């Protein structure tokens, strides 16, 4: 997409709560900057089982930022609510549960169309994963079976939130996150961004900047992973091999 025509405005957050801080505290300034003068936010709570409690928590937190939040699970016409909202917030939790709901409620296309038209998108954890082409880099248990692994395709790369570096002193013999990402790359072409805790990707059209105290770890098929900070815009220029599916 030509950057002059690219209206995407995304904030992709590794984790909604940082150790020692409250819900979305570390992301508040970035959220405020992203939404600007907009006031109404539509919330997608389907990554958690208790949608009422999740919505109440998000409503209270965003109200403290001067924002009015409503949830898609409280309205009769979800697509209409997405169409009318000033911003979209997809919360974290179980990615399989979230993706199943996105497909079953027909939310993939309405969300994608609005975001590509310039409506701000906030995604935390699972909500960040689904901004990519598929859910294939989630670490979550497959507690439900979605009809497809395809997600929103707002960015052409995969996201692996809560990225943990291998601990050389650990006696645990299970797979590391890096090993699992390498398994993904054995079968898939899309680049993967490992987002450490406290990290956020801020997409403004054709520009993407890493925010937060930690570098991201970038994985590409056939290449050694590397650390990256600051401007990560080149990742937006890559082509995904899997598009979104309604």
Regions found by a protein language model. Give the residues of each.
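C-terminal and late-domain segments of enzyme folds
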Residues: 2-37, 49-56, 136-137, 141-246
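Catalytic-core regions built around general acid/base machinery
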Residues: 30, 104-118
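Portal/gating segments that form or line small-molecule/metal binding sites
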Residues: 40-43, 47-98, 103
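Alpha-helix C-terminal capping/helix-to-coil transition sites in glycosyltransferase folds
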Residues: 83-84, 117, 154
